């Protein structure tokens, strides 16, 4: 390996931040699985209404966001440059997923103002993970 392609030594906190990123994306995967396998009989009327109003493309974007995001964070821990691309796709999918709350009237009508807090936090955390990967690549920490 020459000096241009050899990864540089990483900051001591890199591994902790990468593992925290994996945990965040893994929680997203668990949330996705819980929602797509939910027993409709156990849900409240409001929860069923939200599921019924959600378009198929929202669920597809949700799946892409969490599973590609998990792959991206694993690549980040392994210090692979591919992490940036995967996490960029994940971020785009999160934006598509949560745009449904603005674009689909039934979803918007069913959501309370408090219901928008979680999507905003998820977008911010996903952006932070993407930025972490991008910044790590710029610093030469990824190969």
Residue ranges of model-derived segments:
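Topology signature of small-to-medium multi-pass alpha-helical membrane proteins
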Residues: 1-143
């Amino acid at each position: 390996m020459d000096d241009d392609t050899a990864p540089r030594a990483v900051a001591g906190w890199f591994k902790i931040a990468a593992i925290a990123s994996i945990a965040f994306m893994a929680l997203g995967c668990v949330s996705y699985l819980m929602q797509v396998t939910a027993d409709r009989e156990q849900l409240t009327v409001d929860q069923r209404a939200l599921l019924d109003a959600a378009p198929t493309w929202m669920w597809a974007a949700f799946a892409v966001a969490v599973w590609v995001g998990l792959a991206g964070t694993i690549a980040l821990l392994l210090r692979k440059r591919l992490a940036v691309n995967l996490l960029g796709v994940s971020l785009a999918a999160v934006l598509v997923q949560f745009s449904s709350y603005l674009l689909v009237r039934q979803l918007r009508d069913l959501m309370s103002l408090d219901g928008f807090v979680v999507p905003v936090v998820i977008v911010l955390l996903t952006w932070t993970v993407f930025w972490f990967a991008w910044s790590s690549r710029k610093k030469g920490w990824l190969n």
